[in-house]
Amino acid sequence: MLDNRPIPADPNEWRCEDVGNWLKKIGMAKYADLIAMKHKVDGKCLLALTDTDLKDPPVSINCLGDIKKILFAIEFLSQKVVEIGNSGVHHRSTPNGNGPSLKNSKDGLLVEYNEQNHLSISGEDVYTTTRRAEIVEDEETLLDTLAKSSDGTSTVQLISREEIIRQVERPDTYFKSVAKLLIAFAYSSLSFLMTSFVMVLVHDRVPDTKTYPPLPDIVLDNVPHIPWAFDMCETIGLVLAVVWFTVLFFHNQRVIVARRMFSLLGTVFLLRCFTMLITSLSVPGIHLQCEARPNTTMQEKLHKAFHIWSNLGMSLHGVRSCGDYMFSGHTTVITMISHFITEYTPADWTGLHTFTWVLNCFAIFLILAAHEHYSIDVFIAFYISSRMFLYYHAYAYNHAGITATDYRMRTWFPLGWFFEYGSQGKVENEFSLPINIRIPRRVFFAKSEEPKITPKSDSSRKRSSVVAAKQNGNSKNHTKKHN
């Protein structure tokens, strides 16, 4: 009979009853009496068990999954003994002595089990079974996970860092591409929201214009202030955005291209958070009415951040911010859109490319003419946006060769490795509708257009008979001449 006293921390001190309780805890209750009580297996004997002991007589467990589950659980016990520092128990490479070791490694166990859920529908109890999977790295988590199994059956699989890498680097399927797109979209959305919150923080600590006048700037000092310039810059940005999203909508590889857009924009704006927060520059123009707001509550800050985020930070939508100068977000977005239009349209569309970059240059000039940013803000924004776009695509187009020759690339470019490995690299710039639209034939050929058969009148019948007689007479004369 198994007791319910607490199990000692050191497995070497376990009695047979403790081994039986431990087997019940990991979901192997059906073998508790057989192993612990019938064959008198205590803690030390448990640590010495191998797969041969379990599958051969006298134990004779016939289920391979149960054998592996017990062996992996014993492996964690061995790890625990080593951590305790008990020199009486040596660490084995695996439960059976010929497999990979978890000692001093980042390997984990992938545990799959059936979890039973209880639902009440129309007053009746309904039980559903869901297949779950968890990665565990310690004994307590393993035991808790195995105990969740509703039917006592679980699958335990050793999963290593190399296995995770292989899963990420497998060729992309459609589902995997869409999943990456959703992750990239969530990443960019959180980055934009964080940027909006930082914009509120820097506005609350903007330097006083009376104490800190605008800094000397070689461009702003020589270009007069144009009040409507910034609104015109945002209008140009909207035009470029419409062009780009039209291209993206009809592009054959729209999922891959959209994923790259979101991942790049999210990364650049995440970098902008730090550059804005580290150093607060004075306002670039005396026309800007900027005052610090040091006493705002957290709720007010979050409300203002959501206002900026939901309106895309555009002054056309009523967003007014100060202190977010290093570096220019408008220049970043416009430059990134111009790069995407150029990269993902055919090379012979030179007219569109020229039009795009001319608008880009005008937009940058209008930002400076509006005195909304210093020249260094615009220059840094253009440089960072261009370099990030080119570096990311250089890696995306050659990721397989680069990563295969230098494993450190996974550490240096984790975002690019995660999103691009398994992808096809450079994509063909071909266009089509996102969905096939089939229009029924009857829409084009109405019943009114179909030929109608009407009864002939008497006069028309007579004319037809006369014409037929003449044709017969001509054919007979033609035959006589030949004869």
From Swiss-Prot:
Region span, Disordered: 450-483
EC number of the protein: 2.7.8.-
Top-level lineage group: Eukaryota
Record-annotated membrane-spanning stretches: 182-202, 230-250, 261-281, 349-369, 376-396
Alphabetical list of SUPFAM superfamilies matching this protein: SAM/Pointed domain
Keywords (A to Z) from UniProt: Lipid metabolism, Membrane, Sphingolipid metabolism, Transferase, Transmembrane, Transmembrane helix
Main EC class the enzyme belongs to: transferase
Active site: H330, H373, D377
Any single Gene Ontology cellular-component annotation: membrane
Primary subcellular site in the record, as a coarse category: membrane
Compositionally biased tracts (Basic and acidic residues): 450-461
Record membrane topology: Multi-pass membrane protein
Subcellular location: Membrane
Cytoplasmic side: 397-483
Family the entry assigns: Belongs to the sphingomyelin synthase family.
Protein known as: Sphingomyelin synthase-related 1
